[in-house]
Amino acid sequence: MPTSSISFVSPANHARAHSSRRIAWWLFAAFQFFYLLTSTGRVRTPDEYNTLYTTESLVLRGSTAVPQAVELHNFYGRYDLHNRPRAAYPPGQALLCIPWYAFGQYLLARLPGVPADDADLVVAFSSCLSSATFSALTVAFFFLFLVGIGIPARASLFAAAMVGLGTPIFAYSGWLFSEPLSAAIFVGVALLLFGRGHAPIAWRSASIAGLVLGLATLVRPTNALAIPVFALAVLVRDGKPALRAAFILCATSAIGVLALLAHNALLFGGPFEFGYPTAAESAKRLNTFDTPLVKGLYGFLLSPGKSIFVFAPPLILALAGLRRLWKLERGAATMATLLPLVYLFFFARYTQWEGGYCVGPRYMVPSIVLLCLALGPMLAGNAAPFSAARTNAARIKKIALLLLVLGALVQCVSLATSFMEDQVPRGRYYDANWTYRLSYSLSGQIHLLWKYLASGEPARLGLGWDRWFVFLHKGGVSAATLAVVGLIMLAGLGISVAGLARNGRCAS
C-alpha cells in the first residue's frame, strides 16, 4: 500500500510543480513586457545617475570610478584613497545592469532613426529597463513561493497580481533605483528556503541563500539587515535541528559581507568607510540616525506622502493574513513579519528616512513585498473561520480587488509624470533646511496629471508625460523606430498574457 501510494502521489506532485513553473515563466514574461511598456526609461536622481555612471565605467573602462559624474556636475559619492570619484553605493547593482547597458550601447543606439547625439539617452533608457526585469522577477518568485506552500494557483496568481500592480514594485519598475533588485533577491531567497515543501532546510539551500544574502550587501549595505532575520526564521520553522542550517546561512553570508568590507577598506581606507558623502545639500548630514522615532514611524505609517498603506493598499489585507501564513509556513510568517518591522524601526531613525527625491516609502519597498506573502493564505479561502462561509470568501476577494485597484491607481499617478517636476520646487517636498515636509502628498502629481491631460501643448524635454517613447521622441529619435520597439513590446505582452491565461486555466 505505501509503495503504490508513493508512486501515485509523486508524479502528481511533479506534474503540479512543472505546471507552476510554466505559469511562472509566462507570468514573468507578461509582467516583463508590461513593465517595459510602462517604464519611464529615464534616470533623474543622483542615486540613479551614479548607478548608471558606474555601469558605464565598468563597460567602457573596466573601472568603478565615475569621473564623468564630476564633469557633469552630478556626483554623489566620495573620492577614494587615490583621489578617484566613486559612487555612493557599492557596485552590485551596476554590475547586474551591464547586460542592459550593453544592449543599449551596442544595439539600440545603432538602430536606424537614432541620432548619434541621442546615444546617451537611449543607453540610459536601456539601463533603466533592468528594473522592469527585476520587478517582473519579483512577481514570478512571489507566485512560485505561494504555490510552493500550498496556495492554489488561481489564488497565487491573484496575490501576485496584487503585488505586481498594486504596490510600489510597479512604480519602481520604471526607475533605476535598487529596490526592485533587492525585492527580487529577498523573495527569491524566501522561495529557496521556505517555498519548496515542509522538509527540513538542506545545508545546500541554506548555503546558497546565505551567499545570495551576503552578496546583496554589494547592492545596498542595509540589505545586511535581512541576514539575521532569515536565519531566525529558519530556526523558528524547524527548531533545534535547524541550528546547522542557520549557522551555514550566516557563515556563507559572511562571504558577501566581507567582500563589501574589503571593498570599503581598499577604496576608502577602512571597512566601515562607505561611499556616502558626509553631507549633501546645504551641508546637511544625511547618513546619521537623528530622526525622532515617532516622526519616522508617523512618516512611514500615516503621512500622506510616504505611508506604506497609501502606496501599498494590499498591505491592509496582508496584515490580516499573517496568522494564516503562520499556520501554513512558520518560517515565512516570521520573515514576513520581522523584516518589515526591522526595516521600519531602522529607517524611521535614519536622517534621510524619506529616501531623497523619490515616490512613496522607498526604503520599505523590498520588505513590503515580503509582508504581502500573507495575501496568498487570505485569498486561498481554505482556512477557518472564513472557509465556513462562501460569503466571507467572496467578501475577501472583493476587498482584495478594491485594494488592487486603489494600489494600481496610486502607481499610475506616480508614474504618469516625473516626480522630480513636482518635488524639486523649493518648499514642496523639502523645506528651506532640506527637511522633508510631512504634509507632502501625491496631490502635486495629480495636479500635473490633470494639467497635461488638459493641455495640448507639448512639454519641454524632461517634463510632461514621463514615458520612454515620449521623451525619446522629444530627444530626436524617429517615431518609426519607437513604433517598432513599442509594437515588439505589445506583441510580447499579448503573447505572454495569452500563454498565461492558457496555462492558468489548465492549472485550475
Predicted features along the sequence, with ranges:
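Membrane-proximal envelope and lipid/glycan-remodeling enzymes
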Residues: 1-508
